[in-house]
Amino acid sequence: MNTATGFIVLLVLATVLGAIEAEDAVPDFEGGFASHAREDTVGGKIRRSSVCIPSGQPCPYNEHCCSGSCTYKENENGNTVQRCD
């Protein structure tokens, strides 16, 4: 195997691994990311579980915080942003 063939093999391998990894981060219908998707045994539908945003993380839509509330706080740049309590 010469250098060009080895490079092409590595490129294909990286592409395949990237595609597999991208499937784990399927966007849900509310703009967030589902932690995992599983096939429901009744009806064969895919059910995505929602994930709450931990304390101190940005909450741009004022929803999905684990604590249930989101307030404006100053970030490291001095800008005011919404963060989960």
From Swiss-Prot:
Entry keywords, A to Z: Calcium channel impairing toxin, Cleavage on pair of basic residues, Disulfide bond, Ion channel impairing toxin, Knottin, Neurotoxin, Secreted, Signal, Toxin, Voltage-gated calcium channel impairing toxin, Voltage-gated sodium channel impairing toxin
Origin superkingdom: Eukaryota
InterPro entries with a match to the protein in the record: Omega-atracotox, Omega-atracotox_CS
Residue span(s) of the pro-peptide: 23-48
Other remarks on this protein: This toxin comes from a female specimen. It is observed that propeptide sequences coming from female specimen have only limited homology with the male paralogs, but the reason is unknown.
Tissues where this protein is expressed: Expressed by the venom gland.
Any Pfam family: Omega-toxin
Signal peptide residues on this chain, from the entry's feature table: 1-22
Family stated for the protein in its record: Belongs to the neurotoxin 08 (Shiva) family. 01 (omega toxin) subfamily.
Disulfide bonds: 52-66, 59-70, 65-84
Annotated Gene Ontology cellular component terms: extracellular region
PROSITE patterns according to UniProt: OMEGA_ACTX_1
Site (Critical for insecticidal activity): 58, 75, 83
Described function: Insecticidal toxin that reversibly and voltage-independently blocks both mid-low- (M-LVA) and high-voltage-activated (HVA) calcium channels (Cav) in cockroach DUM neurons. Also causes a modest block of insect sodium channel currents (Nav). Induces potent excitatory symptoms, followed by flaccid paralysis leading to death in house crickets.
SUPFAM superfamilies hit by this protein: omega toxin-like
GO MF term (any one): sodium channel regulator activity
Organism expressing this protein natively: Atrax robustus (Sydney funnel-web spider)
Name this polypeptide is given: Omega-hexatoxin-Ar1a
GO biological process, one term: defense response
Cell location: Secreted
Principal location: secreted
UniProt domain comment: The presence of a 'disulfide through disulfide knot' structurally defines this protein as a knottin.
